[in-house]
């Protein structure tokens, strides 16, 4: 009986414990579910609420393992965020589970594992390159520059591309864009405006060698000089080392278009010669094209990589009389186009515009040579009887890959049946094909180029219905592939670290600069561009092209610079961290650029350093001063330690200068171009002032009813030329936001494929050439900043030529631009009242002056009043006995003043020029000490050069001859 009672007691206790345990676990389950239902990620906007998938309790080990869905993995993980998650969830668990060790698994990993190496206290060495490192010669190196970075991206090879591009759609039997035409662009064009003018140059100025699987040159002309079929343009000279035909086939172009599976690099021959170390007797191959148009052309060389190829083949590019030399490692990358650089070339056929290759080398071996290509050109790949009719640069990578000699399997895995899918895959396939056989992809066959990182720059879809909030950025990686390993054996988590860094730093940098941006998800999913590359890779969806608040930033060139610099800095840090090396961020461009005479024929050139408050290491340690004489191109620069330099001028020769800042991390972008001229007989000096620094999006419409960009009101002005416009926006109706068929932002296509000139920052040169043509005056120049900060005293000069271009405070630009700041007004008023002669020209001289004080300045100092805008279609002006035209329509040659000021004289000033419709275009005034000539359009926009010269001579005669 006692045994029975004991048994019943134990049984009842067990049942009670089990019941209590079940209740506790049910309560725990509710707590976990409630935690996830209310969870808000810190710093990340998740499109979907994360949820718990399952949990596992081990009462013996006192552990609780929670498995969450993939959305939980998409947020940012830092040590602090991870610690907070565990602290919060344990605080909500009932007893006894709040004392258990909790672990959260999402996407197959603990959240601790999702902390990137750069933030982790215990870095995961499997994600690092370790002892894998390329220390041979780079694929291409400019050996003419006086400066090389040592703590940047030197000898690092990167594969980088802008998304999408024009493609042939087999389903509709037409060429089309891969993404919709919204807000005057399409993703196929928009992302190039980040990558081409900003990101690639930043990386290259830090020392990187950048491969891009889409054509990078927006030049629509293309000239190919080849040993096959270019009799007058290709010349061989044999002095030491005979030129012979290589055993492998080479490039040869045929007339007409190219069909599927045609490889131009298998159609011809290439040449080779044994090397020599002699500096006196060597053999040369010369490629001298006939340029139909002067302009900027990318230069691509090609060759064969043979067993005894050398790593230091010497190429020289002669560009408008200057020469720049490159060493090319021909042991890699044979049988394709190899980019050297982009240069200015004259029209015509002469020895000052050519490329040469010698057989000089420090090694015994051979150099090989094949075709040389100048310019990006037009698409020439025919699909089902049609070419795109567009510049090659805006086509998809599939077509460039064929033109670049890639195997058929690389660019047409679908055997010509699906160009859309092939274009997605070819970017990564090219990366692997070129990088195969290098230390970073040792188990692939390929061209041995040590590409160690792959990055795709995209924009995304999505918007908020309120039309106000930023949609933001998203990044993508793929870790669950090939057992989580890349080709060299390192963990694919290296790609997640890259994607996380890109996303985190974009948000950090944009918030710092503009006080707003959104971090969206970090996808770890199966995307071709993040799965296929056998090196760390990521896709960065920079913003939404469907969201007007995003694109209001995205269409501003200053924003694109900031975004590109953020990406560059991320790659700089990431690549150096992967190798355990230190790095320095490249500096920003100098400001307050100015040139003044020190004595009669020596100029003092000076500038100021600009520090980046975000980057303490980016301070300049020196500068490169670039010089061009007359119509020649700029030289390769002179290294200057200080912020000034003196140059002795040759009489009668115009000099043009620009400056960049350098440090051990790399080189900044350049300043604007300034000019100087010494005329021994001159008794007067003209100071040219550059007041045109504006880069801007088109005019913005943003109200309760409308959103978008109005190119007719103001097309804005890009940094240099652009291929980024598809057409004018048609639909501004906010109620049609998100409508896929012609909804808000829908745009026309009249501008697609058209190169549109922007602000080249070289208009002082245009003014200087016109003044120098008079042969009467000395010339110096400065930025308007140098006047506003008191670094230049205008009283020293007989005349001031203030060029304002399209400068104005437009109300929507992210940077502040003003034709006449209060400081500049004060300086000009003082100068004019003290007898200085003043020439002012610009499209917004009057219309940018809106306050009573500003209009008083117009009337009292510039002797004019603003009388409206002129949009006379002809762009014709009459004045000084000359009828001439100015650039007033968007074009490839020069920025356009599409709308200009009507300036009426304030008596006793008088009308000096008129537009075709009879409205006043310029005023002149001379009385007492004051002498003025004010133009309502930019002088540099006058199309005819000789008429520019005559007009400038007439203006200066009026201003300076008593």
Annotate each language-model stretch with its function:
Residues 194-206, 214, 384, 673-798, ...:
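Aromatic-Pro/Gly-enriched surface loop or interdomain linker
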């Amino acid at each position: 009986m006692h045994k029975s009672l004991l048994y019943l007691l134990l049984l009842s206790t067990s049942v009670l414990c089990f019941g209590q345990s079940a209740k506790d676990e049910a309560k725990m389950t509710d707590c976990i579910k409630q935690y996830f239902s209310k969870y808000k990620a810190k710093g990340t906007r998740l499109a979907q609420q994360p949820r718990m998938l399952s949990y596992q309790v081990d009462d013996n080990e006192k552990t609780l393992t929670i498995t969450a869905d993939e959305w939980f993995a998409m947020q940012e993980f830092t040590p602090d965020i991870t610690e907070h998650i565990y602290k919060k969830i344990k605080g909500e668990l009932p007893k006894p589970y709040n004392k258990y060790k909790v672990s959260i698994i999402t996407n197959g990993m603990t959240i601790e594992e999702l902390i990137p190496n750069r933030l982790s206290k215990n870095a995961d060495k499997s994600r690092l390159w370790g002892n894998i490192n390329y220390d041979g010669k780079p694929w291409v190196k400019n050996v003419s520059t006086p400066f090389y970075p040592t703590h940047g991206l030197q000898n690092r090879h990167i594969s980088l591309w802008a998304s999408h591009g024009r493609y042939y759609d087999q389903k509709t039997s037409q060429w089309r864009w891969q993404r919709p035409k919204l807000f005057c662009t399409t993703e196929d064009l928009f992302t190039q405006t980040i990558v081409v003018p900003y990101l690639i140059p930043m990386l290259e100025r830090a020392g990187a060698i950048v491969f891009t699987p889409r054509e990078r040159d927006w030049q629509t002309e293309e000239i190919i000089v080849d040993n096959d079929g270019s009799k007058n343009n290709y010349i061989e000279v044999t002095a030491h080392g005979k030129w012979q035909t290589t055993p492998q086939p080479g490039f040869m172009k045929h007339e007409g278009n190219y069909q599927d599976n045609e490889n131009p690099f298998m159609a011809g021959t290439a040449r080779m010669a044994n090397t020599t170390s002699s500096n006196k007797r060597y053999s040369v191959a010369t490629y001298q094209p006939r340029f139909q148009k002067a302009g900027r052309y990318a230069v691509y060389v090609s060759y064969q990589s043979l067993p005894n190829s050398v790593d230091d083949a010497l190429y020289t590019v002669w560009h408008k009389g200057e020469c720049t030399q490159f060493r090319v490692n021909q042991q890699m990358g044979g049988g394709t186009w190899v980019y050297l650089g982009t240069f200015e070339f004259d029209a015509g056929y002469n020895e000052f515009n050519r490329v040469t290759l010698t057989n000089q080398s420090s090694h015994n071996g051979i150099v090989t040579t094949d075709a040389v290509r100048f310019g990006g050109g037009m698409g020439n790949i025919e699909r089902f009887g049609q070419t795109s009719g567009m510049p090659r640069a805006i086509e998809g990578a599939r077509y460039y890959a064929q033109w670049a000699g890639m195997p058929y399997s690389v660019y047409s895995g679908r055997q010509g049946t699906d160009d859309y899918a092939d274009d997605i895959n070819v970017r990564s396939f090219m990366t692997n094909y070129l990088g195969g056989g290098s230390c970073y992809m040792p188990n692939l066959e390929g061209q041995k180029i040590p590409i160690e990182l792959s990055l795709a720059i995209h924009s995304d879809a999505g918007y908020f219905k309120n039309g106000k909030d930023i949609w933001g950025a998203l990044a993508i990686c793929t870790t669950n592939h090939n057992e989580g390993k890349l080709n060299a054996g390192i963990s694919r988590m290296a790609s997640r670290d890259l994607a996380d860094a890109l996303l985190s730093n974009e948000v950090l940098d944009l918030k710092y600069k503009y006080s707003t941006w959104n971090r969206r998800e970090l996808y770890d999913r199966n995307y071709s561009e993040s799965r296929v590359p056998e090196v760390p890779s990521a896709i960065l969806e920079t913003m939404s092209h469907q969201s007007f608040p995003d694109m209001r930033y995205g269409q501003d060139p200053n924003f694109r610079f900031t975004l590109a610099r953020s990406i560059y800095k991320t790659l700089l840090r990431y690549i150096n961290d992967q190798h355990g090396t230190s790095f320095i961020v490249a500096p920003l461009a100098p400001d307050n650029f100015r040139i003044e005479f020190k004595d009669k024929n020596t100029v003092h050139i000076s500038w100021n350093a600009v520090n980046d408050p975000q980057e303490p290491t980016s301070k300049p340690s020196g500068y490169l001063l670039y010089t061009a004489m007359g119509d020649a191109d700029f030289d390769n620069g002179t290294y200057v330690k200080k912020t000034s330099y003196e140059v002795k001028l040759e009489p009668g020769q115009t000099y043009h200068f620009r400056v960049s800042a350098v440090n051990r991390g790399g080189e900044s972008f350049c300043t604007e171009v300034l000019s100087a001229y010494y005329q021994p007989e001159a008794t007067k000096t003209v100071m040219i002032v550059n007041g045109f620094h504006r880069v801007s999006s088109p005019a913005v419409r943003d109200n309760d009813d409308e959103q978008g960009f109005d190119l007719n009101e103001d097309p804005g002005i890009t940094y240099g030329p652009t291929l980024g416009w598809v057409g004018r926006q048609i639909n501004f109706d906010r109620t049609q936001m998100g409508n896929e068929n012609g909804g808000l932002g829908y745009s026309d296509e009249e501008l697609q494929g058209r190169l549109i000139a922007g602000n080249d920052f070289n208009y002082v040169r245009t003014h200087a050439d016109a003044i120098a043509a008079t042969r009467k005056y000395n010339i110096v120049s400065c930025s308007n900043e140098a006047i506003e900060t008191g670094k230049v005293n205008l009283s020293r000069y007989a005349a001031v030529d203030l060029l304002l271009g399209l400068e104005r405070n437009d109300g929507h630009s992210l940077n502040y631009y003003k034709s006449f700041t209060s400081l500049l007004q004060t300086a000009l008023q003082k100068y004019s009242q003290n007898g200085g002669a003043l020439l002012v020209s610009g499209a917004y001289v009057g219309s940018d002056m809106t306050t009573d004080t500003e209009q008083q300045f117009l009337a009292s100092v510039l002797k004019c009043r603003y009388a409206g805008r002129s949009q006379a279609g002809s762009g014709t002006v009459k004045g000084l006995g000359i009828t001439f035209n100015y650039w007033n329509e968007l074009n490839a040659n020069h920025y356009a003043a599409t709308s200009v000021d009507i300036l009426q004289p304030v008596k006793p000033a008088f009308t000096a020029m008129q537009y075709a419709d009879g409205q006043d275009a310029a005023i002149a005034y001379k009385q007492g000490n004051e002498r003025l000539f004010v133009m309502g359009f930019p002088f540099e926009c006058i199309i005819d050069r000789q008429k520019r010269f005559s007009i400038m001579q007439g203006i200066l005669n009026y201003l300076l001859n008593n």
